[in-house]
UniProtKB/Swiss-Prot annotation:
Subunit description: Heteropolymer composed of three CRYAA and one CRYAB subunits. Inter-subunit bridging via zinc ions enhances stability, which is crucial as there is no protein turn over in the lens. Can also form homodimers and homotetramers (dimers of dimers) which serve as the building blocks of homooligomers. Within homooligomers, the zinc-binding motif is created from residues of 3 different molecules. His-123 and Glu-125 from one molecule are ligands of the zinc ion, and His-130 and His-177 residues from additional molecules complete the site with tetrahedral coordination geometry.
Entry's Gene Ontology cellular component terms: cytoplasm; cytosol; nucleoplasm; nucleus; protein-containing complex
Keywords (A to Z) from UniProt: Acetylation, Chaperone, Cytoplasm, Eye lens protein, Glycoprotein, Metal-binding, Methylation, Nucleus, Phosphoprotein, Zinc
Residues with PTM Deamidated asparagine: 124, 146
Binding site for Zn(2+) 3: 177
Places the protein is found: Cytoplasm; Nucleus
Modified residues (Deamidated glutamine): 6, 50, 170
Region described as Disordered: 168-196
Region described as Required for complex formation with BFSP1 and BFSP2: spans on this chain: 1-63
Protein function: Contributes to the transparency and refractive index of the lens. Acts as a chaperone, preventing aggregation of various proteins under a wide range of stress conditions. Required for the correct formation of lens intermediate filaments as part of a complex composed of BFSP1, BFSP2 and CRYAA.
Record PTM Phosphoserine, positions in chain: 45, 145
Annotated protein name in UniProt: Alpha-crystallin A chain
Amino acid sequence: MDVTIQHPWFKRALGPFYPSRLFDQFFGEGLFEYDLLPFLSSTISPYYRQSLFRTVLDSGISELMTHMWFVMHQPHAGNPKNNPVKVRSDRDKFVIFLDVKHFSPEDLTVKVLEDFVEIHGKHNERQDDHGYISREFHRRYRLPSNVDQSALSCSLSADGMLTFSGPKVQSGLDAGHSERAIPVSREEKPSSAPSS
């Protein structure tokens, strides 16, 4: 029996050109030039980058290839500090931080279904800097078994950070599982979400 051995560089079908992350993490953000050819951005001097990108973009890249890069490389994808989702579970508390800066509390629905929290956001078409856009997302997270579901809370900060949190109960106590909606309250101050 023949076994094909691949170099670790090509773990995915298309190697470094195949996406290795979720695409919808930044809801409608812009695109930077280094997102089009990220593997070159660290190897080329900044003095030549601008002209190289202009040459490549102006030299007739097919529309399909351009679209592929737009879809696969969202802004800040490689920077873990800019990840729009942070889930923290320590000894006393379970917290989800989710960047939803394009949504208002009225656009968000947060529900607890058994051992899961479901966060859904949707806004109808509205005008922004680039034209008209509508956005929608749906996230589902498993709650730890010892989270007190009767004390769950959810708030949206002034800078668009949704914070879902619940205290953990000591082992042996009933955490109380049921289906219910969690209201999203609005805070006037920016989020204190961790940066890493």
